[in-house]
């Protein structure tokens, strides 16, 4: 299966019931601290607000945050990282009424409460140390 370019940008329109599905594989051993980053931008510009950032430090922890008016807010972290070294993953981010629900390979790992409405999100960007197989949005 062919890979998508990384970073990968996708124009989106999110609402309650939407789901962003990302499939890929880490390209480095976990010993080298590879990362995966997913950003939900409020415009097609990388300088715009980020309604949700999900950054995985494979084999270590996950950091979630948002950026408003150029200022990063208080980050949330979890040490529960069910990714496997060298193995393909499926990351699903579900848009619920009050939160983004994050699942990896069908396992819920976190819920990030909305601070910026999902309807403001205009672009999803996937970046960092992964071979990206697919990115899609289901509405």
From Swiss-Prot:
InterPro entries: ConA-like_dom_sf (IPR013320), Galectin-like (IPR044156), Galectin_CRD (IPR001079). Residues 6-138 form the Galectin domain. GO terms for molecular function: carbohydrate binding; lysophospholipase activity. Detected in adult and fetal spleen, fetal kidney, adult urinary bladder and placenta. Placental expression originates predominantly from the syncytiotrophoblast. Keywords: Apoptosis, Cytoplasm, Disulfide bond, Hemagglutinin, Lectin, Nucleus. Pfam families: Gal-bind_lectin (PF00337). This is Galactoside-binding soluble lectin 13. The lineage of its organism: Eukaryota, Metazoa, Chordata, Craniata, Vertebrata. The gene is LGALS13.
């Amino acid at each position: 299966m062919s890979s998508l370019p990384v970073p990968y940008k996708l124009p989106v329109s999110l609402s309650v019931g939407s789901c962003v599905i990302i499939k890929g594989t880490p390209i480095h051993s976990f010993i080298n601290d590879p990362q995966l980053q997913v950003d939900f931008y409020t415009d097609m510009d990388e300088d715009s607000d980020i309604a949700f950032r999900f950054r995985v430090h494979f084999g270590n922890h996950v950091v979630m945050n948002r950026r408003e008016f150029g200022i990063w807010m208080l980050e949330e972290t979890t040490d529960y990282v069910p990714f496997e070294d060298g193995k393909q993953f499926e990351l699903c981010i579900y848009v619920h009424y009050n939160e983004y629900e994050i699942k990896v390979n069908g396992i819920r790992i976190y819920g990030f409460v909305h601070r910026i409405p999902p309807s403001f999100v205009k672009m999803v960007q996937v970046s960092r140390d992964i071979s990206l197989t697919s990115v899609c949005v289901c509405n």
